[in-house]
Amino acid sequence: MLYKYCGHSGVQLPLLSLGLWHNFGSVDNFDTASQMILHAFDKGICHFDLANNYGPEPGSAETNFGRILHNNLTAHRDEMFIANKAGHDMWPGVYGTGSSRKNLMASIDQSLKRCRLEYFDIFYSHRYDGVTPVEETMQALIDIVRQGKALYVGISKYPADKQQLAYDILREAHVPCLLSQYRCSMFDRKAQLGGLPTNEDPTKSNFQIAANNGSGIICFSPLAQGLLTVKYDNGIPADSRIAKASAFLHTTDVTPERIEAAKALGQIAKERGQSMAQMALAWVLSDERVTSCIIGTSSVAQMDNNLQALDNLQFTDEEKQKINEIIYKPELSF
């Protein structure tokens, strides 16, 4: 495994981190989930990314992770970097969602209990909810660190203006933002570019704002939820997220333009000696501002395939040009 420092900090993360968004909930096979977490740790993936609403059912990924940790990895807690987040819908009533102090304080206590932990290594505000003042949310994160419930704090998916404000507040309190999470893939470059291809605004680039403020960047959905693999080349498989009526990927996302682009990218990957998925991961990691990339896997074999992306992280100028000619199109973006 290769490791990289988070922004202007002394914390290192593996280039590939394991996300528990899918495949670790109560509807999934517990033994398979356990095998994947233990295999990841054995392979040097020491960073595990959770959120209180991960499952399904919400909270069940935390519960399963806590059980696996308790049964197998308790002695290795100090070798692990465990992340958690709160801010999306979690429990009934007006306090079960959003970025308020009320929600974050209740959420971290619940999450620590489900995960059987005394503290998280990092705790994120999972989103800017559009209503709660950033000052309120950041003060909650600051207090969470001062209470010993998390060592570091982070933000996820914050728009550029709120992102900078969050950094300023945290810095003034001497609790700097360790990590900023954004979605990024060959088909989703808004955070990287500051807008859609051909209409980007570098001043709104979440990546550059993070880099300017010393925050590490961690990317999620690097495979565009399977679109940057061969999964959808010949239609929609019955076991795919789209077929399961995912709230995050729809049949309308599988456009002819994206399928053709994925096939063209697949040819470049083949010439590089990689699978499409491996090249897509390598491409995200090729941005020097990126600390780590979160992968979501459904099997040990799939995880091992993703890990092989680290065998070839370099792109020639010719490869970069060919790739950019394929992906620098607004119609490919989400």
Task: Report residues per predicted region.
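N-terminal small/glycine-rich loop or linker at the start of catalytic domains
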Residues: G7-G25, A83-G96, Y119, Y124
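Beta/alpha (TIM)-barrel catalytic core signal, keyed to glycine-rich beta->alpha loops juxtaposed to Asp/Glu
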Residues: V134-I326
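N-terminal binding-site loop/beta-alpha segment at the start of enzyme catalytic domains
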Residues: M1-M80, R146
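Short, acidic/polar
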Residues: D28-A40, S99-R114, Q164-Y167
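Acidic-and-aromatic substrate-binding clefts and catalytic sites of carbohydrate-active enzymes
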Residues: F24-F30, N53-A61, Y128-P133, A160-Q163, ...
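Alpha-helix N-cap and loop-to-helix initiation/capping positions
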Residues: D28-T32, S60, N64, Y95-N103, ...
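Active-site groove signature of glycoside hydrolases
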Residues: L112-P133
